[in-house]
Swiss-Prot record:
It comes from the Archaea. Belongs to the universal ribosomal protein uL10 family. Forms part of the ribosomal stalk, playing a central role in the interaction of the ribosome with GTP-bound translation factors. The gene is rpl10. This is Large ribosomal subunit protein uL10. Keywords: Ribonucleoprotein, Ribosomal protein, RNA-binding, rRNA-binding. The keyword RNA-binding applies. The keyword Oxidoreductase does not apply.
Length: 334
C-alpha cells in the first residue's frame, strides 16, 4: 500500500518575513529584544517615530526571528531564553547603552487601569470638568473633591490630590481621570537583552548611573595620569607635569645637601636658616648665638627657676668660638 505524504506549505508572508529579518540581522550589529506585553500599540508607534534614523523596530513572531537569526549566522542558543512572550526587536548600529539611555529619557504615559499605582502625584485640577451634573457628583463626593454645579456642569472648586507617587489609584477615580485626559501611569519598553557583535548583555546591565559613571571615569583618569607622571610617559601633557615635579625634587635635594647654584642658592640658605633657628632654639639656654628665638610667656615661679639655672650655667665654661663656628659652617654646607 503506497503512503501518500502531503508537503506542508509555508505561508508566503512568513518566507518574506524571514528574508526581511535576515537582511536586518546582517545590516545591523546590535539587536535588542524588548518585552511589549501590555504595551499600547500607539505608544510603540510613538517610539518608532522618535527612533527613526537611530534604529528600526520590528514586531514579529519569535520562531521567525529564530530562523532568520540562524540563517544570518548568529548563535541562536544565546538568544533562545529571551524568545518568549510578545517581543519587539530593535535593530541598530548604535551602542546598546546609548539606546537604553534614550529610551529611559523618552517618557510615555497611559491611562490608569484597576490595580495601578500612581507614578506621579495625581491631581484633579480646579475648573470645569465638562461632566454633566448627576450621578457623577456622588463619585466626586466619595473622593472628597469639592465641587459646585454651574451651567449644568460639574466644576471642581480647588486642586485636589487623590494619590501620591506609589499610592494605589482609587478605582472610582479612573473614569474621571480618563474624562479629564490625566495619564498617571508611566510606561517604558522593558529591554530583555542586547546582542552586540556576539556579546550578550542582559537588560538589567544596560542601565547605568551617569553621575557614578562620570566619577569612575574621572578617578580612572587621575590614577592613570598620576602613574604616567611618575614614569615620565613621553606625551606633552605628562612631560610638562613630570618636568615640574623633577625640578621641585631636584631643588629640594639641593637645599638638603647644600649644593649652591644661582637657581638653588635661595632654597639652600632658606633651609640652612631654618636649621639654624631650630638649633638655636635647642641650645639658646646654654649659649648666645645672636639669634633671637621667641619665647612663650612663663609663670613667675618658672621665670625665677630659669634665672637660677642661667646663673649656674654662666659659672660653667661654655663652648669655644671655634666649635660654634664649625657648627654653623656645617649648616651652610661648608
Amino acid at each position: 500500500m503506497a503512503v501518500i505524504t502531503q508537503e506542508r506549505k509555508i505561508a508566503k508572508w512568513k518566507i518574506e518575513e524571514v528574508k526581511e529579518l535576515e537582511q536586518k540581522l546582517r545590516e545591523y550589529h546590535t539587536i535588542i529584544i524588548a518585552n511589549i506585553e501590555g504595551f499600547p500599540a500607539d505608544k510603540l508607534h510613538d517610539i518608532r517615530k522618535k527612533m527613526r534614523g537611530m534604529a528600526e523596530i520590528k514586531v514579529t513572531k519569535n520562531t521567525l526571528f529564530g530562523i532568520a537569526a540562524k540563517n544570518a549566522g548568529l548563535d541562536v542558543s544565546k538568544l533562545e531564553p529571551y524568545l518568549t512572550g510578545p517581543n519587539a526587536f530593535i535593530f541598530t548600529n548604535k551602542n546598546p547603552f546609548e539606546i537604553q539611555l534614550f529610551l529611559s529619557k523618552f517618557k510615555l504615559k497611559r491611562y490608569a487601569m484597576p490595580g495601578d499605582k500612581a507614578d506621579e502625584e495625581v491631581v484633579i485640577p480646579a475648573g470645569d470638568t465638562g461632566m454633566p451634573a448627576g450621578p457623577a457628583l456622588s463619585i466626586f463626593g466619595k473622593l472628597k473633591i469639592k465641587t459646585k454645579v454651574q451651567d449644568g456642569k460639574i466644576h471642581v472648586t480647588q486642586d485636589t490630590v487623590i494619590a501620591k507617587p506609589g499610592d494605589p489609584i482609587p478605582p472610582d477615580a479612573i473614569p474621571i481621570l480618563q474624562k479629564l485626559g490625566i495619564m498617571p501611569v508611566h510606561i517604558k519598553l522593558n529591554i530583555k537583552v542586547a546582542y552586540d557583535n556576539g556579546l550578550i548583555i542582559p537588560g538589567n546591565q544596560l542601565s547605568i548611573n551617569l553621575d557614578d559613571y562620570k566619577t569612575d571615569i574621572m578617578k580612572a583618569y587621575q590614577s592613570a595620569f598620576g602613574l604616567a607622571v611618575e614614569i615620565a610617559y613621553p606625551i606633552p601633557d605628562v612631560l610638562k607635569v613630570s618636568a615640574e615635579k623633577a625640578a621641585r625634587n631636584a631643588l629640594s635635594l639641593a637645599a638638603e645637601i647644600g649644593f649652591i647654584t644661582p637657581e638653588t642658592v635661595q632654597a639652600v640658605f632658606s633651609r640652612a636658616i631654618s636649621k639654624a633657628y631650630a638649633l638655636a632654639s635647642a641650645i639658646s639656654g646654654k649659649v648666645d648665638l645672636g639669634i633671637q628665638v621667641p619665647q612663650t610667656q612663663q609663670a613667675p615661679a618658672q621665670q625665677a627657676e630659669k634665672k637660677e639655672e642661667k646663673k649656674e650655667e654662666e659659672e660653667k665654661k661654655g663652648p669655644s668660638e671655634e666649635e660654634i663656628g664649625g657648627g654653623l659652617s656645617s649648616l651652610f654646607g661648608g
